[in-house]
């Protein structure tokens, strides 16, 4: 994996810079184990865990409140997180300046971090292929930026 210079701003080089959160997490499942870092917006709390993402069950569910939550959970429920798909509106994919490994950040519309996923460095070639499929990271312009759109109703 080639180290990249982190961008000062978010710029996409992808031809189709959108996907659903469900599709993105589905693509990341085989790249584990993944370190998941969940940020609590507005609170001084961060939760980190390393998880075998290949075992994730991914599910979207409309709640009685009208919100749609995406859940990633292990079968034994020892690991589980929920994201409001209306709040998680953007994702960046690139190479971490800190770890020099793969990094995916799920962001709010104002750019605040909700979730950071660090796929396994042993799966760097697979992550690089995923980046290339999405247009590749431009070392001068930074990470790939994806708009996260709602999953179409079936």
Predicted feature descriptions by range:
Residues 1-154:
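Eukaryotic intrinsically disordered, low-complexity regulatory linkers and tails enriched in Ser/Thr/Pro
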């Amino acid at each position: 994996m080639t180290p990249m210079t982190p961008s000062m701003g978010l710029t996409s080089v992808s031809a189709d810079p959108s996907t659903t959160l469900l599709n993105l997490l589905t693509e990341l499942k085989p790249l584990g184990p993944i370190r998941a870092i969940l940020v609590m917006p507005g609170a001084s709390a961060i939760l980190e865990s390393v998880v075998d993402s290949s075992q994730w069950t991914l599910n979207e569910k409309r709640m009685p409140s009208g919100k749609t939550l995406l859940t990633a959970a292990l079968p034994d429920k020892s690991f589980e997180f929920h994201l409001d798909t209306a709040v998680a509106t953007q994702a960046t994919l690139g190479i971490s300046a800190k770890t020099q490994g793969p990094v995916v950040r799920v962001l709010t519309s104002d750019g605040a971090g909700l979730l950071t996923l660090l796929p396994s460095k042993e799966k760097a070639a697979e992550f690089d292929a995923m980046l290339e499929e999405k247009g590749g990271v431009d070392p001068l312009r930074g990470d790939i930026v994806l708009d996260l759109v709602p999953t179409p109703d079936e």
